[in-house]
Amino acid sequence: MNLHEYQAKALFAEYGLPVSEGYACDTPQEAVEAAGHIGGDMWVVKCQVHAGGRGKAGGVKVTGDKEEIRAFAEHWLGKNLVTYQTDEKGQPVAKILVESCTDIANELYLGAVVDRATRRVVFMASTEGGVEIETVAEETPELIHKAIIDPLTGPQPYQARDLGFKLGLNPTQMKQFTKVFMGLATMFTDHDFALLEINPLVITTEGNIHCLDGKIGIDGNALFRQPKIRDMHDPSQDDAREAHAAKFELNYVALDGNVGCMVNGAGLAMGTMDIVNLHGGKPANFLDVGGGATKERVAEAFKIILSDANVKAVLVNIFGGIVRCDMIAEGIIGAVKEVGVEVPVVVRLEGTNADLGREVLANSGLDIIAAESLTDAAVKVVAAAEGK
């Protein structure tokens, strides 16, 4: 689950981190009033969506005219913002963040992730602020400095000082940076973050450290113990199909291909997508129906897959371990009849009672294409998607 920038900065403020005075506004009039409340003669207005690249897409504006703030809000509220991180439809703008303007002398980067390799929270800092960290990692990896947080001892001030020295901070900035580092590290574990970015973390013209942006991703598996964070969820930013899938405990991720994939098991699902790619196809989705591939869940999975108009064929790849393949086959048949599937469906069954499951499919009277192996299934579904 992701948070909006204004929500991230509200959390920063709770932990004593330096952020700009700002207000999230629902109407153009609120935006104008927010600028008046903030004071000053320059403001920054930002569309609030769960995507980067807002500035290049026109979703960020610096202005000293309150009527320009009104015009900006009137233009964007209720519309979708399309950036390089969204699909062609973009994401809806329901709030505009109005902030005081900050004079910038230098831009830095500070972020943290849960690193699977070290099984630790890892902080990353760089002098290359305002640039995508992936670009820095690819082109100049030596400019990324890391601090690994030991879960037993927690974050330590010396780790912040070590990063600060590498960033070239002066003694005053070092103290400020240490406070930011310690606050973020505490916040990361307190609220079960999966990702945290301040890009840019700036040094103002007055020489102070300031959090100019904020990006937070929450571990969805921990939301049951984070009621405050859970209430911050903005469902308008979710993909409609992914949100529908979550209601039925289906793991679905929309992609841009034309071969729908329905698989039980995340590893098998990824392998299925790989082999579809290998044989010239493009998966339209990742969909893991989990261990309990019941008729109801399979039916919902078909509905979700077929709600994508780009899907030209569906590959169902099921390994019967705990559940029997003949039961799964009956579920597939019932789901196909209920949903009224009109595109070719290729089914590969393996595991417990696989032969009986294939027999059930063959005797169903439905136009279901049986596959003997995963390779055979991939070849057949790619051909079906191409109309061959």
UniProtKB/Swiss-Prot annotation:
Mg(2+) binds at N199, D213. It catalyses: succinate + ATP + CoA = succinyl-CoA + ADP + phosphate; GTP + succinate + CoA = succinyl-CoA + GDP + phosphate. It is an enzyme of class 6 (ligase). One of its GO terms (cellular component) is cytosol. GO terms for biological process: succinyl-CoA metabolic process; tricarboxylic acid cycle. InterPro entries: ATP-grasp (IPR011761), ATP-grasp_succ-CoA_synth-type (IPR013650), ATP_grasp_subdomain_1 (IPR013815), Succ-CoA_synthase_bsu_CS (IPR017866), SUCC_ACL_C (IPR005811), Succ_CoA_ligase-like_bsu (IPR005809), Succinyl-CoA_synth-like (IPR016102). Disulfide bonds: none annotated. Pfam families: ATP-grasp_2, Ligase_CoA. GO terms for molecular function: ATP binding; magnesium ion binding; succinate-CoA ligase (ADP-forming) activity; succinate-CoA ligase (GDP-forming) activity. Keywords: ATP-binding, Ligase, Magnesium, Metal-binding, Nucleotide-binding, Tricarboxylic acid cycle. Its cofactor is Mg(2+). Binds 1 Mg(2+) ion per subunit. Its EC number is 6.2.1.5. It comes from the Bacteria. Substrate binds at N264, G321, I322, V323. ATP binds at K46, G53, R54, G55, E99, T102, E107. HAMAP family: Succ_CoA_beta. PANTHER family: SUCCINATE--COA LIGASE [GDP-FORMING] SUBUNIT BETA, MITOCHONDRIAL (PTHR11815:SF10), SUCCINYL-COA SYNTHETASE BETA CHAIN (PTHR11815). Heterotetramer of two alpha and two beta subunits. Succinyl-CoA synthetase functions in the citric acid cycle (TCA), coupling the hydrolysis of succinyl-CoA to the synthesis of either ATP or GTP and thus represents the only step of substrate-level phosphorylation in the TCA. The beta subunit provides nucleotide specificity of the enzyme and binds the substrate succinate, while the binding sites for coenzyme A and phosphate are found in the alpha subunit. Belongs to the succinate/malate CoA ligase beta subunit family. This is Succinate--CoA ligase [ADP-forming] subunit beta. The gene is sucC.
